[in-house]
């Protein structure tokens, strides 16, 4: 069994459901410390974070390449639906099964073993290798990567490149990498009306009827046209509720939850202003609470994307696609202190599902790609 596969199985065997790390980071720390990494555990409200650094011969003047990821996994769902226990690694039909196999314990193992192989061949490497690992990515993400980033900002730590081990591939390893992500902003809208008897609408104000024209306009609005890297911004309703449950009472208020997924072609302030303008135009009496869970980030083609594309092509023969589709990731936090952030990991077809798995044939090539990037950028 390869070293990467063995470490992957060791990590899968830990039931590290958010935010419980279950000593996964301790396993990684022991391996990294043996290589000469300075390892720091940063705990916050039950979340375990790891910042590990191995300086190169150029010291703080050298380039720093960070591997970022998460040890936490999503809940298993109904255990009886799993073909084999989710935290007992199992091999069937050329696949390794277990919760976290694809998202993202194989990537973590590949990071570690790639670093071990790189240091063995390049003991006097010039640049710096770092690990930024959290147990709070699948959950609220309030005490994980963002806390480490804030600490590094306070220390004046500079990251030049970061690879986030998210499962970005689709059919084959390396067919898709993410060089950016859209931002996410949600709104909680309450439109006020006057509750009344449904037979006497002139004595009431039905907030559903009041909201409907504005809702239609919001749904039809083209917020932007996107750009070279991002599709157009989208606005979607996730929840709409009003009424008491009775058939003869008009509601006193209508509650609407909505979400923007927005590109670098729009700003938070601009989108908020346009929503308020539409609501005000329709004369609504309302309250609106905003929450921004992530700003868009983008890494244009450059040193990191070039090194990763070359490593993937050399290892797999595949020409990769740069993409910004999908949801948010911890890359949105890391982009605050790192100009080049790219996500790359194994195929994502089984993530968060019953019988999550990874094809064993992808495990060592993933490690090899990570090692090749180290060789290109910091050797």
From Swiss-Prot:
Cofactor(s) required, per the database record: Zn(2+); Co(2+)
Pfam families: M20_dimer, Peptidase_M20
Biological process terms in GO annotation: diaminopimelate biosynthetic process; L-arginine biosynthetic process; lysine biosynthetic process via diaminopimelate
Pathway(s) per entry: Amino-acid biosynthesis; L-lysine biosynthesis via DAP pathway; LL-2,6-diaminopimelate from (S)-tetrahydrodipicolinate (succinylase route): step 3/3
UniProt binding sites for Zn(2+) 2: 103, 138, 352
EC number annotated for this UniProt entry: 3.5.1.18
Listed GO MF terms: acetylornithine deacetylase activity; cobalt ion binding; succinyl-diaminopimelate desuccinylase activity; zinc ion binding
Active site: 72, 137 (proton acceptor)
Keyword Phosphoprotein in record: no
Matching InterPro entries: ArgE/DapE_CS, Bact_exopeptidase_dim_dom, DapE_proteobac, Peptidase_M20, Peptidase_M20_dimer, Peptidase_M20A
Cofactor: binding details: Binds 2 Zn(2+) or Co(2+) ions per subunit.
Highest rank taxon of the organism: Bacteria
Alphabetical UniProt keywords: Amino-acid biosynthesis, Cobalt, Diaminopimelate biosynthesis, Hydrolase, Lysine biosynthesis, Metal-binding, Zinc
Reaction catalysis annotation: N-succinyl-(2S,6S)-2,6-diaminopimelate + H2O = (2S,6S)-2,6-diaminopimelate + succinate
Binding residues annotated for Zn(2+) 1, in chain numbering: 70, 103, 166
Subunit structure: Homodimer.
Role noted for this protein: Catalyzes the hydrolysis of N-succinyl-L,L-diaminopimelic acid (SDAP), forming succinate and LL-2,6-diaminopimelate (DAP), an intermediate involved in the bacterial biosynthesis of lysine and meso-diaminopimelic acid, an essential component of bacterial cell walls.
Protein name, as recorded: Succinyl-diaminopimelate desuccinylase
Originating organism: Burkholderia orbicola (strain MC0-3)
């Amino acid at each position: 069994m390869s070293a990467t596969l063995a470490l992957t199985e060791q990590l899968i065997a830990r039931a590290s459901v958010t935010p419980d790390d279950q000593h996964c980071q301790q396993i990684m720390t022991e391996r990294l410390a043996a290589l000469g990494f300075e390892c720091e555990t940063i705990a916050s409200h039950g979340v375990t974070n790891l910042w590990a650094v191995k300086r190169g011969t150029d010291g703080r003047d050298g380039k720093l390449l960070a591997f970022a990821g998460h040890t936490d996994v999503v809940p298993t769902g109904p255990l009886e639906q799993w073909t084999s226990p989710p935290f007992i690694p199992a091999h069937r039909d050329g696949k390794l099964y277990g919760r976290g196999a694809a998202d993202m314990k194989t990537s973590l193992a590949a990071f570690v073993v790639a670093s071990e192989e790189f240091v063995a061949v390049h003991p006097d490497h010039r640049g710096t290798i770092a690990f930024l690992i959290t147990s709070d990515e699948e959950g609220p993400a309030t005490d994980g990567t963002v806390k480490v980033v804030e600490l590094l900002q306070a220390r004046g730590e500079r990251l030049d490149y970061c690879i986030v081990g998210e499962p970005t591939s689709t059919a084959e390893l390396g067919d898709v990498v993410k060089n950016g992500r859209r931002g996410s902003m949600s709104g909680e809208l309450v439109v006020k009306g006057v509750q009344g008897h449904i037979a006497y609408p002139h004595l009431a104000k039905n907030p559903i009827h009041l909201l409907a024209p504005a809702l239609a306009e919001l749904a039809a609005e083209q917020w932007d046209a996107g750009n070279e890297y991002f599709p157009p911004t989208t606005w979607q309703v996730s929840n709409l509720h009003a009424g008491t449950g009775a058939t003869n009472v008009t509601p006193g208020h209508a509650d609407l939850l909505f979400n923007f997924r927005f590109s670098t072609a729009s700003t938070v302030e601009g989108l908020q202003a346009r929503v308020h303008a539409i609501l005000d135009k329709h004369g609504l009496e309302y309250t609106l609470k905003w929450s921004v869970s992530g700003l868009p980030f983008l890494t244009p083609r450059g040193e990191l994307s070039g090194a990763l594309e070359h490593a993937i092509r050399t290892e797999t023969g595949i020409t990769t696609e740069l993409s910004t589709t999908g949801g948010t990731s911890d890359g949105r936090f890391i982009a605050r202190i790192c100009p080049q952030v790219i996500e790359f990991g194994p195929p994502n077809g089984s993530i968060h599902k019953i019988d999550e798995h990874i094809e064993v044939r992808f495990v060592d090539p993933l490690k090899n790609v990570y090692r090749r990037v180290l060789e290109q950028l910091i050797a």
